[in-house]
Regions:
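Noncatalytic scaffold domains of N-terminal-nucleophile
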Residues: 1-122, 127-129, 133-176, 240-241, ...
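Gly/Pro-rich active-site capping loops and adjacent beta-alpha segments
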Residues: 1-19, 181-209
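Short alpha-helical scaffolding segments that buttress acidic/His motifs in well-ordered protein cores
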Residues: 31, 116, 188, 214-218
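General N-terminal targeting signals
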Residues: 44-45, 124, 164, 182-184, ...
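Short Gly/Pro-enriched turn/cap motifs at secondary-structure boundaries
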Residues: 104, 179, 267-271
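Short helix/loop capping segments that flank catalytic or ligand/cofactor-binding pockets
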Residues: 136, 174-175, 181-185, 227
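Short glycine-rich loop/turn motifs
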Residues: 160-162, 185, 272
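Internal maturation/activation junctions in enzymes
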Residues: 195-272
């Protein structure tokens, strides 16, 4: 994993573009309150937390927050599975019988509240050094991670040009490299706007097939053409052009699925 950049990025925006009418502590107070005292979760969150019980049990910090009313019975079930006393199917069934989250239940995250308090009080140093940094490094050491104290101290965010495109006359403004998401988003929209999506029933065979094929093409390009602009010249104008989208679409058949192994990245004409 990379060094967490959201904290530094948001603080940079606050510093560069904030009105100056509020302190950082004032702005962060509501988030701290929600983390410390809790808030009611919706049904989607409840279902999501319950579906990842087995994964959360692999990490003590996650388990105590996202498994409802965790107790020794749950830990005993996990240990029985680790010892080979339960099959994968039996393990899943026992976890499914554990008390589950319901819509409206209160989610409390005390550790997150403490982290937010340190950031609110000390800014970047409240995350990239001091107590929070120590906790991150402890986690790295315990789980063979790669982030070092020096990585945290040297991190700084930079402004990048956004990716701009259109979809049926709607303007798209998204993130630019090193994130690949913005370029792929525009590229995929460029491809699917050549189809009458309204005529397709949502989640129908035709609908899912088209989205799958479009994503296959886009991700093949991502693997070859996109990277950190400080080290790799990504052909953004080509990837986000309407003409390139039509060229890539010629590889799609609406009658059969393409094997992912048969999909190659498009030719980078800017290198010629």
């Amino acid at each position: 994993s990379g060094v967490p950049g959201t904290v530094n990025g948001l603080l940079k925006i606050f510093s560069d573009y904030g009105s100056g009418n509020f302190t950082l502590e004032e702005i962060m107070a509501p988030a701290i309150d929600y983390a410390e005292n809790g808030y009611p979760i919706n049904g989607v969150a409840a279902q999501g937390f319950d579906s990842y019980k087995a994964l959360f049990l692999n990490d003590e910090g996650s388990a105590k927050i996202f498994i409802k009313d965790i107790n020794n019975d749950i830990l005993d079930i996990q240990q029985a599975f680790i010892n080979g006393e339960l099959s994968q199917d039996e393990y899943g069934k026992k976890l499914a019988n554990i008390d589950e989250w319901q819509e409206g239940d209160i989610l409390i995250q005390k550790d997150l509240a403490n982290t937010l308090k340190r950031i609110a009080k000390n800014g970047n140093s409240g995350f990239y050094s001091g107590k929070t940094a120590e906790l991150i490094i402890q986690e790295m050491v315990a789980n063979n991670g790669f982030i070092t104290k020096e990585d945290l101290l040297s991190y700084h965010s930079v402004y990048r040009d956004p990716i701009i495109g259109t979809y049926r006359n709607n303007l798209i403004i998204s993130m630019g490299p090193p994130s690949s998401g913005g370029a792929l988003l525009v590229q995929m929209f460029n491809m699917i706007e050549n189809f009458d999506m309204k005529s397709m029933e949502r989640n129908s065979t035709e609908f899912v097939h088209l989205l799958t094929e479009v994503q296959r093409l886009a991700y093949a390009d991502r693997a070859i053409h996109l990277g950190d602009p400080d080290f790799w010249p990504s052909p953004i104008p080509m990837l986000t052009s309407k003409e390139y989208a039509k060229e890539r679409l010629s590889l799609i058949s609406m009658n059969s699925a393409t094997r992912s192994t048969e999909i190659a990245a498009g030719k980078n004409l800017s290198k010629e």
